Amino acid sequence: MTSPDERKSFWERHEFKFYRYGHVYALIYGQVVIDYVPQRALKRGVKVLLIAYGHLFSMLLIVVLPGYFCYHFRTLTDTLDRRLQLLFYVSFTNTAIKYATVIVTYVANTVHFEAINQRCTMQRTHLEFEFKNAPQEPKRPFEFFMYFKFCLINLMMMIQVCGIFAQYGEVGKGSVSQVRVHFAIYAFVLWNYTENMADYCYFINGSVLKYYRQFNLQLGSLRDEMDGLRPGGMLLHHCCELSDRLEELRRRCREIHDLQRESFRMHQFQLIGLMLSTLINNLTNFYTLFHMLAKQSLEEVSYPVVVGSVYATGFYIDTYIVALINEHIKLELEAVALTMRRFAEPREMDERLTREIEHLSLELLNYQPPMLCGLLHLDRRLVYLIAVTAFSYFITLVQFDLYLRKKS
């Protein structure tokens, strides 16, 4: 006979290891607030030291190092190839947007420290317990999305590390200054700082999607039971039981919506920064590919340029799946509303059961996907818009490139 552990999926056996890895990696960057699934409470003294370290590390990124790189700005962009210099300017702008996102992330984490812990982390843990006995089919897509995100992020980290080593190897040849290597490391740290929070937000939204799907399955099961009601002496008793269960489901649905709303409210400015960074990354990617194709042979293309192009593509995919999760949440809410419209009314409808159905239907009308800063919906349309906008700016860069080529 197989043991219970052998019947578990790989994710179920190692789930908490993934969460612990994410928490430890966030602690390296001073983000104590990021704890996917709290497993062991930190001692007060250790927590105070980690918070102090987080403030010092953030001040180093926000105040000290930018001054150093601004002082060496000319060194960062100095090159005899004017077309390559244009690429440096675009990359510098990309890092500047990451820097602004880091500032927003630091302020948000500081201001919403307790709120993120209570309204996101603990609320998600509470909902996980509430849906412990719910249908487990929605866990499989959730596991896939988490696997994919984990592999993609680690692949992007390895690509950036390879790019840094490539630049470091060229320093000895005198083709790239030491300052540019430092700047590449700085950009890598900025990306990790913002990505930690983006991954946490992705985790919360992925959990919201899973809970909505489990909620919809429970709602469908309850609907099937209502369809099976027959007139008789126990009808009112069954209606009372169904009313209690529907009231419980309505409370859970409200908690799921509150979790998504609070997560968006506290992370919306960081997500806006992520969208802007994606825009510049796509612009850099388009122009990098053009820069490669404009060369007479691929042998003349530097290795960091190729690595940067691959990284920008991965960054776009990363942003796309973040938006895709929100797209699926919107579709799942529509599916829940459809399930509610299909509720059958027994011949002798209990007044309380009717009231619960009406209350849940009315609440679902107000459960619209939250907007970023009240301006934009984070869905696939926004990602497509970013790609089109980046391509439009890319055409402008190509015009500058052609002008510089003629001038040289």
Swiss-Prot record:
Extracellular-facing ranges: 39-48, 108-144, 292-304, 403-408
Residues on Cytoplasmic side: 1-20, 70-86, 166-270, 326-381
GO terms, molecular function: ligand-gated monoatomic ion channel activity; taste receptor activity
Tissue: Expressed in the medial aspect of the third antennal segment, and in neurons of the terminal external chemosensory organ of larvae.
Membrane topology, from the record: Multi-pass membrane protein
InterPro entries: 7TM_chemorcpt (IPR013604)
Family annotation (Pfam families): 7tm_7
Localisation: Cell membrane
Superkingdom of source: Eukaryota
Family: Belongs to the insect chemoreceptor superfamily. Gustatory receptor (GR) family. Gr10a subfamily.
UniProt protein name: Gustatory receptor 10a
Species this chain originates from: Drosophila melanogaster
